[in-house]
């Protein structure tokens, strides 16, 4: 996986002694390395409190064992234990995931703890002069021997299979946010948003802390479908679904349980052979057929929109058009059974109740904040067009007192809560000179994506016509993406006000469980994706039933 540039310690280990004058003037000492020598037989426990150390030189001593407390030195990148009499290593050494160099030459090691395989950032592992088994020595002699040995140790980590059955993460809590509206007819339904981590992206280069067998799709897919089914959501939005897996796995599994679905792969699929196309990922939406009827389905290709609306903008052509992300949307009609179940009273009248569910996966690269923002504007613009056209064509039967078709937007936006993307969605617009545009010239082309119509820019601000609210607000979920290098919120469920409310959400995975089990990133043998799913129960406010003597009669509860 990507590593920060590593500078090994200077072997000369030069030092300076602070003068009394410097000390009197308030100069602070700073030392990040420590060398202990002189045939030392044991180490003081106070050593483990020096957590600021980045390098520890303990070679040429008479140490026979290393205490497990060494793992408290979590900032160490360099550890030299060569030329001692060490016979065994503590398993806790595997928790020192910042290590880049570990020197164990000329000791008395016969075995290595499998936990050393967790040192995925290690670049040098020196083992010369130890009576190790031949299979370990053979791995060390191979090209890229350190990496091969670490992979072997991690894949054979003792007890991993047993821990899967005994140390499952505790259930995520169900957080109630408000009670249903008892004063009017409503329909309740649940929505899941989940990036399942496509097989081709689940590599040891990206996720070096995860055993290869736990990255394998045949292993991960069982836990993924188990999580999806355990939520029993009425609507499921998935990102990073491989084309072949959509048709051979997800659709098969979910159809058996009463779902129908719609899927589109990323735009690159159109230029590929049939065999290559199978491995292109995309976005999928599933819905329970007992509660919804499919009216329309749509695919939004951002590179096609960029080409058609570039208006001479080089940034649009060179940065946005070259990315093949997509979004999908389905227009669903609520079945009368869902309305009856939720309102407690038969649905009267002939009007249809529609809802639009949209799902998208925006570009990943943090350096392309402008592209993510433009892609989001494109998607909202197309979603608005879909809703407007559906409203016009069915206006005699779909528009109640709320005035428009409600929207549920699920997405891996690859954008943090303080980004221009989330500002645009949650506040209704964004300035054309927003920092996320990186001072690139998008202005003329951006007006085409204003959801208030072409040239709908107001005072240098691009706006959209929705009132959107996030189901997960106020830190309810500290992170939706959890890897070693990045932990943050990038997945969202938005819904349109005033037609929709959030009643409850599925809370975060227990942080203490992650810490206690030294889980530095996901996926993990117990967590099948690098994303955590979002799951919310929503309430749709329905039009009042026909008036009797001028009084609205709400459904019975």
From Swiss-Prot:
Residues where Mg(2+) 1 binds: 240
CDD domains assigned to the protein according to its UniProt record, in alphabetical order: Deadenylase_CCR4a
Entry keyword annotation includes Transcription regulation: yes
Binding site for substrate: 240, 276, 361, 366, 414, 481, 486
Region (Nuclease domain) location: 153-557
UniProt remark on cofactor binding: Binds 2 magnesium ions, but the ions interact each with only 1 or 2 residues.
EC number(s) on file: 3.1.13.4
Enzyme class: hydrolase
GO process terms (BP): miRNA-mediated gene silencing by mRNA destabilization; nuclear-transcribed mRNA catabolic process, no-go decay; nuclear-transcribed mRNA poly(A) tail shortening; positive regulation of cell population proliferation; positive regulation of cytoplasmic mRNA processing body assembly; regulation of translation
Main location as per UniProt: cytoplasm
This protein's UniProt keywords: Activator, Cytoplasm, Exonuclease, Hydrolase, Leucine-rich repeat, Magnesium, Metal-binding, Nuclease, Nucleus, Repeat, RNA-binding, RNA-mediated gene silencing, Transcription, Transcription regulation, Translation regulation
Cofactor(s) required, per the database record: Mg(2+)
Cell compartments where the protein resides: Cytoplasm; Nucleus
Catalytic reactions of this protein: Exonucleolytic cleavage of poly(A) to 5'-AMP
Positions annotated as LRR repeat: 52-73, 75-96, 98-120, 121-143
UniProt GO MF annotations: metal ion binding; poly(A)-specific ribonuclease activity; RNA binding; RNA exonuclease activity; transcription coactivator activity
Binding site for Mg(2+) 2: 412
Active site positions: 412 (proton donor/acceptor)
Record family assignment: Belongs to the CCR4/nocturin family.
Quaternary structure and partners: Component of the CCR4-NOT complex; distinct complexes seem to exist that differ in the participation of probably mutually exclusive catalytic subunits; the complex contains two deadenylase subunits, CNOT6 or CNOT6L, and CNOT7 or CNOT8. Interacts with CNOT7 and CNOT8. Interacts with UNR. Interacts with ZFP36L1 (via N-terminus). Interacts with ZNF335.
Stated role: Poly(A) nuclease with 3'-5' RNase activity. Catalytic component of the CCR4-NOT complex which is one of the major cellular mRNA deadenylases and is linked to various cellular processes including bulk mRNA degradation, miRNA-mediated repression, translational repression during translational initiation and general transcription regulation. Additional complex functions may be a consequence of its influence on mRNA expression. Involved in mRNA decay mediated by the major-protein-coding determinant of instability (mCRD) of the FOS gene in the cytoplasm.
PANTHER family, per database record: CARBON CATABOLITE REPRESSOR PROTEIN 4, CCR4-NOT TRANSCRIPTION COMPLEX SUBUNIT 6
Listed name of the protein: CCR4-NOT transcription complex subunit 6
Species in which this protein is naturally found: Mus musculus (Mouse)
């Amino acid at each position: 996986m990507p590593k920060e540039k590593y500078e090994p310690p200077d072997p000369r280990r030069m030092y300076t002694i602070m003068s009394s004058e410097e000390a009197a003037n308030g100069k602070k000492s700073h030392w990040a390395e420590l060398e202990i020598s002189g045939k030392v037989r044991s180490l003081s426990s106070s050593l483990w409190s020096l957590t600021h150390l980045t390098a520890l030189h303990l070679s040429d001593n008479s140490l026979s064992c290393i205490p497990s407390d060494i793992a408290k030195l979590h900032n160490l990148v360099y550890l030299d234990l060569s030329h001692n009499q060490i016979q065994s290593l503590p398993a806790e050494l595997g928790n020192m995931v910042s290590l880049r160099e570990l020197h164990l030459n000329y000791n008395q090691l016969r075995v290595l703890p499998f936990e050393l395989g967790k040192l995925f950032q290690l670049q040098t592992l020196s083992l010369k002069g130890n009576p190790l088994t031949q299979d370990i020595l053979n791995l060390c002699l191979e090209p890229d021997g350190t990496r091969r040995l670490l992979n072997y140790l991690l894949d054979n980590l003792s007890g991993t299979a047993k821990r899967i059955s005994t140390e499952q993460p505790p259930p995520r809590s169900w957080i109630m946010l408000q009670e249903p509206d008892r004063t009017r007819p409503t329909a309740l339904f649940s929505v899941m948003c989940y990036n399942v981590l496509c097989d081709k992206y689940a590599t040891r280069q990206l996720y070096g802390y995860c055993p290869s067998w736990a990255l394998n799709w045949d292993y991960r897919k069982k836990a993924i479908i188990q999580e999806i089914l355990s939520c029993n959501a009425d609507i499921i939005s998935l990102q990073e679904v491989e084309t072949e897996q959509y048709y051979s796995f997800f659709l098969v599994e979910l159809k058996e349980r009463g779902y129908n679905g719609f899927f589109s792969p990323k735009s690159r699929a159109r230029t590929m052979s049939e065999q290559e196309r199978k491995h292109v990922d995309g976005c999928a939406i599933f819905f329970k057929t007992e509660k919804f009827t499919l009216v329309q389905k749509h695919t939004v290709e951002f590179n096609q929109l960029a080409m058609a609306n570039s208006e001479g903008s080089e940034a649009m052509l060179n940065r946005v058009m070259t990315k093949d992300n997509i979004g999908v949307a389905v227009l669903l009609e609520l079945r009368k059974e869902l309305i009856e179940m939720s309102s407690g009273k038969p649905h009267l009248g002939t009007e249809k109740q529609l809802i639009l569910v949209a799902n998208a996966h925006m570009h990943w690269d943090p350096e392309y904040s402008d592209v993510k923002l433009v892609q989001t504007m494109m998607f909202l613009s197309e979603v608005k067009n879909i809703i407007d056209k559906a409203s016009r064509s069915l206006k005699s039967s779909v528009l109640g007192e709320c005035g428009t078709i409600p929207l549920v937007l699920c997405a891996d936006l690859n954008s943090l809560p303080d980004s221009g993307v989330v500002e645009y969605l949650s506040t209704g617009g964004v300035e054309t000179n927003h920092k996320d545009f990186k001072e690139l010239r998008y202005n003329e082309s951006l007006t085409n994506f204003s959801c208030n119509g072409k040239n709908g820019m107001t005072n240098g601000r691009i706006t959209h016509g929705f009132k959107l609210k996030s189901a997960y607000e106020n830190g309810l979920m500290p992170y939706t993406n959890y890897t070693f290098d990045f932990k943050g919120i990038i997945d969202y469920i938005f819904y349109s006000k005033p037609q929709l409310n959030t009643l409850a959400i599925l809370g975060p995975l227990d942080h203490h469980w992650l810490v206690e089990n030294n889980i530095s990133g996901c996926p993990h043998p117990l967590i099948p994706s690098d994303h955590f799913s979002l799951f919310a129960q929503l309430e749709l406010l329905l039009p009042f039933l026909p008036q009797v003597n001028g009084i609205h009669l709400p459904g019975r509860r």
